[in-house]
């Protein structure tokens, strides 16, 4: 295969480019400017995925460590403190660590690319999207209270939304407010509010409900990352999903280059992403059911149930898998 053009510039784009270059495929990233996430928390499983993709065990050595998770979720129950193991860093810092060497220029591409991988939501304007919810979120910089433990994170449900406080240093962090402005939600808070000394200005709102693009691929193109799926930050698995999508997408393109059937490989890719999206909706449904009762919470549950019904209908038409991942490559079954 001569070349692959990757339209994006985030985590999925970097993972796709690296995996394809490792396999000897000429890939070029056409970056799309978009705001970077100020803080992301990666659990041990996601850290291991990145270490395997980029063949580096030192990617997260300098990250801020989270060792405890304090949860006030079920109405009427006391907060629960649970052990945790995660690392916090900004999206920009993560990309700086995984982007090794200067990226090839698009002018260096030998003719038209044989495949395009679209990884940026802003570059997927012609796609049809299915949204399961309408909740908005906003992230605000904060200064932690002196008594707040910087190795902990906090999540709290409230009558019309929820708060997540994530330290990213000894005395600073980010507050994610979902369902309403941070100040309004903090006025009802009994847990998160006590961990704050100062609340900064939010950088703007963004959708926080699950969404999926349809179709996810066709001959000569695939959608990956935010151009394919959108995840609820409640589950904290968006970055890990982006890396997994990149693994599967790059494996599909490699299989096509080796003579595999294009239609069946694209079908496998779409089925894999659809199944992962359904699992995410199931987790969301469990979390929102376990939270509070009231109009806002009932709406979130109904939205996730609608998504589960839609994905069930779509997956009913999916054939049995014809491939499986072995490492970073697909192998045919049977």
Annotate each predicted stretch with a short phrase.
Residues 4, 26, 114-116, 222:
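Hydrophobic "anchor" residues on beta-strands that sit immediately upstream
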Residues 9, 100-201, 210-213:
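Predominantly flavin-linked oxidoreductase catalytic cores and closely associated redox partners
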Residues 181-267:
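FAD/FMN-dependent oxidoreductases across multiple families
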Residues 7-9, 18-40:
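Glycine-rich FAD pyrophosphate-binding loop
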Residues 18, 22, 100, 155, ...:
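Short, well-ordered alpha-helices that flank and scaffold nucleotide-derived cofactor binding pockets
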Residues 45-141:
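Conserved N-terminal helical subregion
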Residues 1-12:
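Beta1/beta-strand and adjacent pyrophosphate-binding region of the FAD-binding site
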Residues 254-334:
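C-terminal helical "tail/cap" subdomain of flavin- and related membrane-associated enzymes
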């Amino acid at each position: 295969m001569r070349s692959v053009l990757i339209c994006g510039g985030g985590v999925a784009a970097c993972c796709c480019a690296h995996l394809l270059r490792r396999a000897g495929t000429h890939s070029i990233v056409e970056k799309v400017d978009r705001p970077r996430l100020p803080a992301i928390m990666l659990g041990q499983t996601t850290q291991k995925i990145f270490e395997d993709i980029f063949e580096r065990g030192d990617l997260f050595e300098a990250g801020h460590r989270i060792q405890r998770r304090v949860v006030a979720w079920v109405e009427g129950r006391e907060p629960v403190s649970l052990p945790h193991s995660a690392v916090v860093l900004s999206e920009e810092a993560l990309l700086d660590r995984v982007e090794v060497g200067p990226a090839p220029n698009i002018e260096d591409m030998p003719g038209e690319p044989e495949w395009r991988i679209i990884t940026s939501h802003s570059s997927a304007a012609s796609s049809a999207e299915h949204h399961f919810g309408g909740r908005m979120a906003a992230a605000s910089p904060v200064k932690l209270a002196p008594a707040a433990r910087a190795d902990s994170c906090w999540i709290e449900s409230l009558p019309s939304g929820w708060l997540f406080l994530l330290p990213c240093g000894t005395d600073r962090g980010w507050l994610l407010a979902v369902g309403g402005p941070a100040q309004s939600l903090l006025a009802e808070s009994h847990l998160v509010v006590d961990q704050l000394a100062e609340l900064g200005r939010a950088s703007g709102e963004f959708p926080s409900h699950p969404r999926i693009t349809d179709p996810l691929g066709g001959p000569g193109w695939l959608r990956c990352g935010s151009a394919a799926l959108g995840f609820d930050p409640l589950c904290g698995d968006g970055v890990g999903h982006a890396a997994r999508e990149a693994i599967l997408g790059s494996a599909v393109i490699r299989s096509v280059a080796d003579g595999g059937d294009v239609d069946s490989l694209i079908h496998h890719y779409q089925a894999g992403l659809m199944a992962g999206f359904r699992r995410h909706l199931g987790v969301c449904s469990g979390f929102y059911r376990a939270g509070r009762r009231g109009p806002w919470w009932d709406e979130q549950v109904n939205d996730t149930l609608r998504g589960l019904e839609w994905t069930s209908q779509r997956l009913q038409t999916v054939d049995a898998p014809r491939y499986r991942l072995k490492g970073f490559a697909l192998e045919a079954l049977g």
